[in-house]
């Protein structure tokens, strides 16, 4: 339960820290600041941020040769399915994963592992993937609807591939390049035959596939943390936490710089997070207003 502002009786109040054993609050309507006993303090729930990656099978198609040709939908003889997935919660050492059994792989039956990844996506506030928006999530949604599954609860998406392409002029934007260049967790080497063997249901090869998948997720987390200070429009964690914190990492260790950010109408002091090093701005339209909200530039 959120406290009522003693001046305007609004419940639109925001936590501002602790003072002398009491919780400080700020009213977002009239800007009155007040304190309450610690009984009012709600548990601080850090947003559930999920990093994930999937591995898919091949499509099987028929044609009239190996030359360049357009494959039409009626030439598909076997549809694609999900071989494995891997995921981890941000900062959690535990990497979760699931892979089809040899029998499921031979039958191209991925419904069991679709249910397990669906549960994680349904819990998440934010999901992170490399090419996740264009590939992984669209593939999963197609498999969900193909198996008559309902969509998971809505979440925000951070696509590290889109971030890298938008913010940098690198020689390559593949995760394999980024992890090697920045000396992060490297992807494991694979070959095309691995996918053939997984479809054949060879147990050892299915284990190799999911291990490859798990390494991808560990590398993805490191890529995300490396790129994070440069991410514009990162989902505002302060909104999810209902706290006046760094919108990028959720920490409250902010230092005001001597610089300001200008728009056509206002100017804002720039703060830098001492944890993730991201520069942010705090709402402050003139010198008499006290900064109340931190957001990304």
Predicted regions and their residues:
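Conserved RNase H-like, two-metal-ion catalytic cores of nucleic-acid enzymes
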Residues: 40-121
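Short, cysteine/histidine-rich loop/knuckle motifs that typically chelate Zn2+
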Residues: 7-10, 29, 247-248, 275
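Short metal-binding segments enriched for Cys and/or His
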Residues: 31-42, 273-294
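Metal-dependent phosphoesterase core characteristic of DEDDh/y 3'-5' exonuclease domains
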Residues: 47, 80-98, 123-229, 233-237
């Amino acid at each position: 339960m959120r406290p009522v502002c003693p001046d305007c009786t609004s419940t639109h109040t925001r936590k501002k820290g602790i003072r002398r054993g009491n919780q400080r609050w700020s009213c977002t309507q009239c800007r009155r600041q007040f304190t309450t006993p610690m009984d009012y303090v709600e548990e601080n729930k850090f947003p559930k941020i999920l990093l994930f990656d999937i591995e898919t099978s091949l499509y099987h198609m028929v044609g009239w040769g190996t030359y360049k040709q357009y494959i039409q939908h009626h030439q598909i003889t076997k549809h694609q399915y999900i071989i494995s997935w891997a995921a981890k919660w941000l900062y959690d050492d535990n990497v979760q994963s699931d892979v089809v059994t040899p029998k499921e792989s031979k039958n191209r039956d991925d419904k069991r592992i679709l249910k397990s990844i669906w549960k994680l996506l349904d819990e998440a506030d934010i999901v992170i993937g490399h090419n996740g928006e264009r590939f992984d999530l669209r593939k999963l949604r197609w498999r969900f609807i193909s198996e008559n599954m309902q969509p998971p609860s809505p979440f925000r998406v951070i696509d590290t591939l889109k971030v890298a392409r938008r913010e940098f002029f690198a020689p390559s934007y593949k995760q394999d390049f980024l992890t090697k260049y920045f000396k992060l967790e490297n992807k494991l080497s694979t070959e095309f035959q691995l996918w053939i063997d997984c479809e054949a249901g060879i147990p050892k090869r299915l284990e190799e596939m999911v291990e490859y998948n798990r390494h991808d997720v560990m590398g993805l987390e490191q890529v995300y943390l490396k790129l994070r200070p440069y991410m514009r429009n990162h989902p505002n964690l302060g909104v999810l936490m209902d706290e006046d914190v760094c919108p990028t990492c959720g920490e409250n260790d902010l230092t005001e710089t001597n610089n300001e950010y200008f728009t056509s109408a206002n100017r804002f002091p720039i703060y830098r997070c001492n944890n993730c090093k991201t520069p942010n701005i705090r709402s402050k339209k003139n010198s008499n207003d006290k900064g109340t909200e931190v957001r990304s530039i």
